[in-house]
A protein has these predicted regions:
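Bacterial Sec-dependent N-terminal signal peptides
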Residues: 1-11
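N-terminal cap/lid segment of alpha/beta-hydrolase-fold proteins
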Residues: 10-63
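Mobile cap/lid helix-loop segments that gate and shape the active-site cleft of serine hydrolases
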Residues: 33-39, 186-221, 227, 254
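Short beta-strand element of the alpha/beta-hydrolase
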Residues: 65-74
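Catalytic nucleophile-loop/oxyanion-hole region of alpha/beta-hydrolase
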Residues: 80-82, 87-90, 105-142, 274-281
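Primarily recognizes the serine-hydrolase "nucleophile elbow" in alpha/beta-hydrolase
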Residues: 122, 126-195, 213
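Short beta-strand/loop motif that positions the catalytic acidic residue
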Residues: 231-233, 237
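C-terminal catalytic histidine-bearing segment of alpha/beta-hydrolase fold enzymes
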Residues: 242, 246-297
Length: 297
């Protein structure tokens, strides 16, 4: 049973009890800072994560809907943008009655882990398991637990939404399928023509095996069992090509998976909650989509 004082304080909860799977000794220490190079107000950046955590943001009791979302911030698998793609998003979900969990997943590094290409997925699956197994404590419906990701966090979320087989044998009997996905300017593909090669290099290496490229090109992994998905992208995104979202959407349609895609004309990459080039609020559209799919009342 989790300590309610920890939950109310929005304290980071260790993702694993005891020894970290796939970890090996290294000199890195957890580190975060405010980066002002990208925007004047600065963004919260985490560039070293040795102990993955999950932080719960609970809505007021009178607003609870029983729906939950696990949020994976982006950062090219080299950093995590923990503020505008993490905590800020969790807080607006709370206003809609959704319990939100911000995941600080391990960043793939050969010197700190074995089989680095599977470690972020391992952490995402552990987060899904954690939330489902603690659903009563969080007043959550175990059948309304989704995963959300921005940029490379969208790659991780879409990987979790297309790869249900457990990375760890310890979770062999667990239900690791998210009930829905929300993907915001996501990296989807690792193929040369549209893939984000920085994310690919960090996760599977600069000269990857073609089998790994296929495995982690999630537009090629969609099946009828893939969960309903809401996608947002900007047409002028020169960081992660909009074809990532378009091809994933096409794969969802082909497999008759409920899906909705919002393509802005402008907005670029990394706008978080606020695409300032338009009056359209993608988050409101997302909430409406969740209601239409009976994920929210």
């Amino acid at each position: 049973m989790l300590n309610t004082s920890i939950l109310n304080a929005q304290q980071a909860i260790p993702l694993y009890d005891g020894e970290l799977p796939n970890a090996k000794p290294c000199n890195e220490k957890d580190h975060e800072f405010i980066d002002t190079s990208w925007m004047k107000s600065g963004i919260l950046v985490v560039d070293h994560i040795t102990r993955p955590t999950i932080t719960v943001f609970e809505p007021p009791a009178e607003k609870r809907t029983g729906t939950a979302v696990i949020i994976c911030p982006g950062g090219g698998y080299g950093i995590i943008a923990a503020g505008h793609e993490g905590a800020d998003v969790a807080k607006v979900f709370n206003e809609a009655g959704v319990t939100a969990f911000v995941l600080r997943y391990r960043l793939p590094k050969d010197e700190c882990m074995t089989h680095k290409e599977y470690v972020p997925l391992m952490d995402a699956q552990q987060a899904i398991y954690f939330v489902r197994s603690h659903a009563p404590q969080f007043h959550i419906d175990p059948n309304k637990i989704g995963i959300m990701g921005f940029s490379a966090g969208g790659h991780l979320a879409s990987t979790a939404g297309t790869h249900f087989n457990p990375v760890r044998n310890e979770l062999a009997n667990a239900n690791l399928r998210p009930d829905f996905m929300i993907l915001i300017y996501p990296v989807i593909s690792f193929n040369e023509d549209i893939g984000h090669l920085g994310s690919r290099d960090n996760l599977i290496g600069k000269d990857p095996d073609t089998k790994l490229v296929h495995l982690f090109s999630n537009e090629e992994q969609v099946t009828p069992k893939t969960p309903p998905t809401f996608l947002v992208h900007a047409s002028d995104d020169d960081g992660v090509k909009p074809e990532n979202s378009i091809r994933f959407y096409e794969a969802l349609l082909k497999n008759k998976v409920p899906a909705e895609l919002h393509l802005f004309e402008h907005g670029g990459h990394g706008f978080g909650l606020h695409n300032t080039t338009t009056s359209e609020d993608w988050f409101k559209s997302c909430i409406n989509w969740m209601k239409a799919n009976k994920l929210l009342p």
